[in-house]
C-alpha cells in the first residue's frame, strides 16, 4: 500500500468524511473543547483538501486512512487530521501516512513536521514520541484557561 494524493481526481468524499469522524469519535467524551473534526462537512472537507496537501491510504479499494498537511513558514509542515479507521489502527497505516508527509516536507525544503494533540490523549503523545516527535510547547484553545493541547515536532 502506498499513500495516494487527495486531489481533484479523488472521488470518495463521503467515505473520507466518515473515516475522519469514526477515527476521532473515541476522543469526544475525553476532550474539551470538542475536536474540530466534528465541524467538518463535505464542502468544508473538499475545501480543506484544495487548500492543503492530503494523502489517503487505500487498500483493495477501501479507504483506511488520511493525513492533511500545510506549510508553516519558515521551516515546518503542519500535520492535521491524521486519521485511520478504527479496525485498521495499529497496523502501520498512520506511520505510512506520516512518511508521505515527511517526503512532501523534504521535497518542499521544510526541515520539520509539527502537530498538536490534545493534552488528555496521552496514548497519542506516546505514539508520536515513538515516531520521533518531541514535545515543544503546550497551549490552550481560545476561551480556555487550562492547557488543552501539546505541540510536538519532528526534525527531518
Q: Where are the model-predicted features located?
A:
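Generic structural motif
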Residues: 1-3, 135
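Conserved glycine-rich acetyl-CoA-binding loop
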Residues: 62, 85-99, 106-108, 119-126, ...
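C-terminal "cap" of GNAT-fold acetyltransferases
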Residues: 42, 46, 111-125, 129-131, ...
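Acetyl-CoA-dependent GNAT
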Residues: 4-81, 85-87, 98-100, 104, ...
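Generic detector of contiguous secondary-structure segments
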Residues: 3-13, 93, 110-119
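Short, contiguous hydrophobic alpha-helices characteristic of membrane insertion segments
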Residues: 66-69, 128-132
